[in-house]
């Protein structure tokens, strides 16, 4: 999100993976499929910053963002159940097929290129990275600082037992290479990879969503962004999960629902979307998140991308108030699209005993 500032400037880059047959490829980077790429002009950006500095903003009610003790015995002892644990923001631990998978891991204090400035973590981490089971795979959705944290990536690469497999969008592999991070698999939209697990094979697909990328003023849209579909065994039938990454609302989601036939569980962002005149199209609000839930045909969805950093103008606790209203507007049962407390775990499907 901090990389919004970097979208105000640009310098030509070369896309080493450019394939003219793919509509989302271009010689200097990548495109969205349904809208023009995010190009925040300088007057709009500085208007937003002026409003942030001098306008009225609702206070964060941080006490409303629950934190629960991590169920470490369950997570370390799990051998086949499908579980989900919300660590904060877009960082989620999935256990499926006997594998431990982290999405967009961020255990740092700031979502920023600098350790002394930028959006600070407002709610405490529910666990240290080292307290989790050994991580087998990391799914990175894009390279913004609230999703790709350098310190966390290096800590994971140095974990006991060896580094996880880092599954990353095209171009992010080059950043990993420059950082000396091993065991990286780059993915284009619709690529898939099969991960052998002790409780069965887990298949990971990289899929299109509507967003953008940048970490500097010179690499806008130079690397790809996206979401993930994860399929594995859960008892007698396959279990299918969707991670939307960071995204605006788009026709991509109905396509995903049709192509995969629906999802047992989805991670959908619900925070960082105000002011709408600036963020609409690239960040969903709660109403659009519920529409994604319906479009992808999700049986159960968990709201992410909230409760951790204040990156936009709505208060950190806003989804606690706005998601119930959005569910009611769309006729979605309360139990079908939920919010967790930090550190909360749920068993989604039990393995065959």
Write out the residue ranges for each language-model feature.
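Metallo-beta-lactamase
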Residues: 8-120, 125-131, 169-243, 322-344, 348-351, ...
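Extracytoplasmic
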Residues: 79, 87-89, 132-133, 140, ...
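Acidic/histidine-rich helix-loop elements
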Residues: 107-124, 212-220, 274-283
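Bacterial N-terminal signal peptides
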Residues: 1-9
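Conserved catalytic scaffold of divalent metal-dependent phosphoesterases
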Residues: 102, 106-110, 187-192, 199-212, ...
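Cap/insert and terminal regions of metallo-dependent hydrolase folds
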Residues: 12-37, 121, 128-132, 136-137, ...
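Active-site HxH/HxHxD metal-binding segment of metal-dependent hydrolases
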Residues: 107-115, 126-193, 208, 216
